[in-house]
Amino acid sequence: MEFNFIINKLVQLDQQGLGVYIPRASRSKVSSQQEQQLGQVLNTMGERSAIAQGLKQVITNYDKVQGTDQRVYIVAEGRTCQGFLKVGQKNLFYRDMMGNIKEIKPLCVLDFYVHESCQRQGYGKLLFEYMIQCEQTSPEKLAYDRPSPKLIAFLKKHYNLVKYIAQNNNFVVFDQYFRSDASSQNKQNQNTRSYSQPYSDYSSQIPTNYPQQQQQQSNSKSYPYKQENNIDLMQHSSSRNNKEFLNAGRAILSKEEIYKKDNLSQQNIENTLNNINNSQYSTKSQQQQQYQKDYQLDKYENNWGADKNIKKPPFPGQDRQLDKIQQKIQQTERELDVVNQQIIKQRQNLSQDPLTQNHRAQNVYNTNQFGTSPWAQTGFNYYSTSSSNYGNHYTYYKK
């Protein structure tokens, strides 16, 4: 963004064109004309930043910066201002994943803008690194006020900052903020030694002619399990040179104890074998082996089909199939029993119905009075009925 005046006269810049504007410190040193020019720079850049971020209100303004501890970092060259970055401390209430609220006071990035004509040329990273160096902090120790998608992508690309928990105050605090606190405390608690001289210089100070007896005494005092009384030597028979190994203070077993352990181990083996033989799985495997010996499947499969009278022997697993078939048969029998019971209940209900009782009584009366019709036993296929005072009259017809 170009202006009609030189920005170097308003803010002290270094060789790379980087500088910082601190309102409290620089207000007394700046004239009224320079204040107007600074206000013009901050107002125009703040408006462009709000338009680029799609904000309804302008965040950065010359009047808003005055009377605060905020700092505005600027990158400029001559009459052009490439971008700015505004920071300041804020008291924030942070809610974690468990719902716990913490009060923190981090340094916050309040506004960050690089002109469209200067983007993707390294000005943003240069300005951000300059701010970190001046504030003596790191990117994960910062809080970001309403960061735009471009700023989030910038932090992910250059500083690997991705994970954060959304807050009601629209500030973004990355998870590394709290991890860095824990790591810094751990570093302070650790008792580390730093030697300015190389290791070779220290090794030259160690005495070479150290008495051997004193070394043994010191080892026995500091490490009691290395004393001579508690050390047992045993020769390794498989080693070529008959090397001697330390038993680490353990007493060597006698022959009787070794025999006892061997007997116990043999008893345990016998018990396990008996358990295996008595188990149901072992019996099934034995049955399969006996089946292979008795029926000789290879010979049987070769002769199968030559003599149809030979019955196919039972194969392994046939018992399971028979069990399944029996279960299905039992299930169908149960279903038939249920159906029969339902039929019996329906018959009982019909017998108790008054309509069916009247119908049966009328039929009994007709048969007793007139007798059965001889035509019913003939080859007539259908008939018609007509009622009268004497009962039902049947008229039979042929096809």
UniProtKB/Swiss-Prot annotation:
EC number: 2.3.1.108
Bias (Polar residues): 183-193
Name of the protein this chain belongs to: Alpha-tubulin N-acetyltransferase
SUPFAM superfamilies: Acyl-CoA N-acyltransferases (Nat)
Record keyword Signal present: no
Domain N-acetyltransferase residues, every copy: 1-178
Record has Transferase as a keyword: yes
Gene3D superfamilies: 3.40.630.30
A cellular-component GO term for this protein: microtubule
Family recorded in the similarity comment: Belongs to the acetyltransferase ATAT1 family.
Site (Crucial for catalytic activity): Q53
Catalytic activity: L-lysyl-[alpha-tubulin] + acetyl-CoA = N(6)-acetyl-L-lysyl-[alpha-tubulin] + CoA + H(+)
Superkingdom of source: Eukaryota
PANTHER family, per database record: ALPHA-TUBULIN N-ACETYLTRANSFERASE 1
Alphabetical list of InterPro entries matching this protein: Acyl_CoA_acyltransferase (IPR016181), Atat (IPR038746), GNAT_ATAT (IPR007965)
Enzyme class: transferase
UniProt organism field: Tetrahymena thermophila (strain SB210)
UniProt function note: Specifically acetylates 'Lys-40' in alpha-tubulin on the lumenal side of microtubules. Promotes microtubule destabilization and accelerates microtubule dynamics; this activity may be independent of acetylation activity. Acetylates alpha-tubulin with a slow enzymatic rate, due to a catalytic site that is not optimized for acetyl transfer. Enters the microtubule through each end and diffuses quickly throughout the lumen of microtubules.
Stretches with biased composition (Low complexity): 194-223
Binding site for acetyl-CoA: 112-125, 148-157
Keywords in alphabetical order: Acyltransferase, Transferase
